[in-house]
Amino acid sequence: MTMASVLVLLSLVLCCFPDTAFGVEVDCSKYPNTTNEDGKEVLLCPKILNPICGSDGVTYSNDCLLCAYNIEYGANVSKDHDGECKEAVPIDCSKYANATNEEGKEVPLCTKILSPVCGTDGVTYSNECLLCAHNIEQGTSVGKKYDGECKKEFATVDCSDYPKPVCSLEYMPLCGSDSKTYNNKCDFCNAVVESNGTLTLGHFGKC
């Protein structure tokens, strides 16, 4: 099997908005592996579509591709449940009273009541109203993953070998601290170097 074929197999990761973060371990030892040109272990995953939802809220095409993602990014994602991840929880921002800020823009009048929610950007908001306010002020469309604080990713991305002049087309998305989705590690690390290290990992998967 060529290296290109391996990259294609590893790129069959489908994404959706994150959900919950507890799951069961997947037995990755049953999948064959090989070594790529950089001397790194990669898994040879089948193209079988049997989607699972990872504990990071990302939908993987099958168990093997979740394992491949863990190896590639040094993550420890487990399986939350079989099937695709659920969509973000809808929120009704119209129920909050509005006021006009200094810029003449209408923004919700939010209380200081602490009732944290986790946004689809991986950021914890003190309450649902403040998530709505963030969307209006920043022009974003962040949804609510679930009630409660976001469960943090402890994995990091090693960008010491970057930048690189050309990145592959493999799709293993990462969400940067700038709320931008990067197609793969190479795209993300090139951006990290360009930002002089100010860009960090928000979470694995699409923003």
UniProtKB/Swiss-Prot annotation:
One CC-aspect GO term: extracellular region
Keywords per UniProt: Disulfide bond, Glycoprotein, Protease inhibitor, Repeat, Secreted, Serine protease inhibitor, Signal
Site (Reactive bond 1) residue list: K47, I48
Residues annotated as glycosylated: N33, N76, N98, N196
InterPro entries xrefs: Kazal_dom, Kazal_dom_sf
GO terms for MF: serine-type endopeptidase inhibitor activity
Domain (Kazal-like) ranges: 24-87, 88-152, 153-207
Name the record gives this protein: Ovomucoid
Naturally occurring in which organism (per UniProt): Dromaius novaehollandiae (Emu)
